[in-house]
């Protein structure tokens, strides 16, 4: 059984990773295909 502390740290880590991937994706997307 997962404890609350493990679940909390897992959720925070997952959230940070997702935000980082989204930011990187948008940065690469705007760099590779500049909007005219």
UniProtKB/Swiss-Prot annotation:
Note: Present with 2430 molecules/cell in log phase SD medium.
KW Transmembrane helix (keyword) present: yes
Organism: Saccharomyces cerevisiae (strain ATCC 204508 / S288c) (Baker's yeast)
Protein family membership: Belongs to the OST4 family.
Keyword Transmembrane helix listed: yes
Effect of residue 23 to D: Severe growth defect
GO biological process, alphabetically ordered: protein N-linked glycosylation
Its biological purpose: Subunit of the oligosaccharyl transferase (OST) complex that catalyzes the initial transfer of a defined glycan (Glc(3)Man(9)GlcNAc(2) in eukaryotes) from the lipid carrier dolichol-pyrophosphate to an asparagine residue within an Asn-X-Ser/Thr consensus motif in nascent polypeptide chains, the first step in protein N-glycosylation. N-glycosylation occurs cotranslationally and the complex associates with the Sec61 complex at the channel-forming translocon complex that mediates protein translocation across the endoplasmic reticulum (ER). All subunits are required for a maximal enzyme activity.
Record localization: Endoplasmic reticulum membrane
Matches recorded under Pfam families: Ost4 (PF10215)
Result of altering residue 21 to K: Abolishes interaction with OST3 and STT3; disrupts interaction between OST3 and STT3
GO cellular component: endoplasmic reticulum membrane; mitochondrion; oligosaccharyltransferase complex
Entry GO MF terms: protein-macromolecule adaptor activity
Protein name as it appears in the record: Dolichyl-diphosphooligosaccharide--protein glycosyltransferase subunit OST4
Subunit architecture: Component of the oligosaccharyltransferase (OST) complex, which appears to exist in two assemblies comprising OST1, OST2, OST4, OST5, STT3, SWP1, WPB1, and either OST3 or OST6. OST assembly occurs through the formation of 3 subcomplexes. Subcomplex 1 contains OST1 and OST5, subcomplex 2 contains STT3, OST3, and OST4, and subcomplex 3 contains OST2, WBP1, and SWP1. Interacts with SEC61, SBH1 and SSS1.
Superkingdom field: Eukaryota
Effect of residue 24 to D: Severe growth defect
Primary residence: endoplasmic reticulum
Effect of residue 20 to K: Severe growth defect; abolishes interaction with OST3; disrupts interaction between OST3 and STT3
Lumenal side: 1-9
Keyword terms of this UniProt record: Endoplasmic reticulum, Membrane, Signal-anchor, Transmembrane, Transmembrane helix
Annotated InterPro entries: Oligosaccaryltransferase, Ost4p_sf
Ranges per topology, Cytoplasmic: 29-36
Biochemical pathway: Protein modification; protein glycosylation
Taxonomic path: Eukaryota, Fungi, Dikarya, Ascomycota, Saccharomycotina
Membrane-protein topology: Single-pass type III membrane protein
Ranges annotated as spanning the membrane: 10-28
């Amino acid at each position: 059984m997962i404890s609350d502390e493990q679940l909390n740290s897992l959720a925070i880590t997952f959230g940070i990773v997702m935000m980082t991937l989204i930011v990187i994706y948008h940065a690469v997307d705007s760099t590779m295909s500049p909007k005219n």
